[in-house]
Amino acid sequence: MSWITPELIEIVVAILKAIVILLVVVVCGALLSFIERRLLGLWQDRYGPNRVGPFGMFQLGADMLKMFFKEDWTPPFADRLIFTLAPIVAMSALLMAFAVVPVTPTWGVADLNIGLLFFFAMAGLAVYAVLFAGWSSNNKFALLGSLRASAQTISYEVFMALALMGIVAQTGSFNMRDIVEYQAQHTWFIIPQFLGFCTFFIAGVAVTHRHPFDQPEAEQELADGYHIEYAGMKWGMFFVGEYIGIVLISALLVTLFFGGWHGPFGILPQLSFIWFALKTAFFIMLFILLRASLPRPRYDQVMAFSWKFCLPLTLLNLLVTGAFVLAAQ
């Protein structure tokens, strides 16, 4: 057994950690579809799913079975290869982006010094998946939806990145673990970077194409947008991917602005995973509450809001942060 070296054991443990974390993320994304329907029913004074199992608890299993057995149909005039690759690229980009999010002091898939840059690289890759889906479907509604989605994502990613430059200026690092530890030694960034938090949260909702920024999938205008031609497991990958995106943005908000796995004032540090999960769940509920309470604006209003309101606010935050950093030196 001389081939079993400490390096090999370390590699195997790292791979197992990555598999466990990514499986938890996928399961959470799938469960969110049921949780959202139940919460929307509660807030809108109706029952929600309540037919399969007690209190509708087995509805998710029924939906998964239905998805598995639906016909995996491809439009006759579609580009079959690109049409198939689009949901795979979308799901892969989301899971790879989650790799740089530290869950606890010891649990995380990858501890990269360029963690923030890696996240934005994967977020940019997801834009290609949306364009692939719309163009390869050979459907005008799908193409319009993909063009809307790509323009919206690229626009909001601009100040999404700028919103985090204030954090980078204060910590001097793109590493997410360094950012979390900096907050433990000083204060959570929600206080000194409040403007950055607001713009990052707005951009996160827009990048995940969630209500009220779901114009790329507007049923009344585009009949579900770029996944109109998808069915079966391909559609399921887009569907679950949307909820994984919610988990990802919520986890990033916790990591970058709310101390990551640390509790308030350093309370009960041994419950690091519980603190991280509770804070992430709060932002997930906030995503669902936005869907239940806000109307959908016009697409031109969404784009004007990004460039005329959010971008100047982000630049103001960056200017103020730079002034404080220079004054502190």
From Swiss-Prot:
Signal peptide interval: none
Membrane topology: Multi-pass membrane protein
GO cellular component, one term: plasma membrane
Keyword Cytoplasm: no
UniProt keywords, alphabetically: Cell inner membrane, Cell membrane, Membrane, NAD, Quinone, Translocase, Transmembrane, Transmembrane helix, Ubiquinone
GO MF term list: NADH dehydrogenase activity; oxidoreductase activity, acting on NAD(P)H, quinone or similar compound as acceptor; quinone binding
Subunit structure: NDH-1 is composed of 13 different subunits. Subunits NuoA, H, J, K, L, M, N constitute the membrane sector of the complex.
Family: Belongs to the complex I subunit 1 family.
Protein name: NADH-quinone oxidoreductase subunit H
Species this protein is from: Azotobacter vinelandii (strain DJ / ATCC BAA-1303)
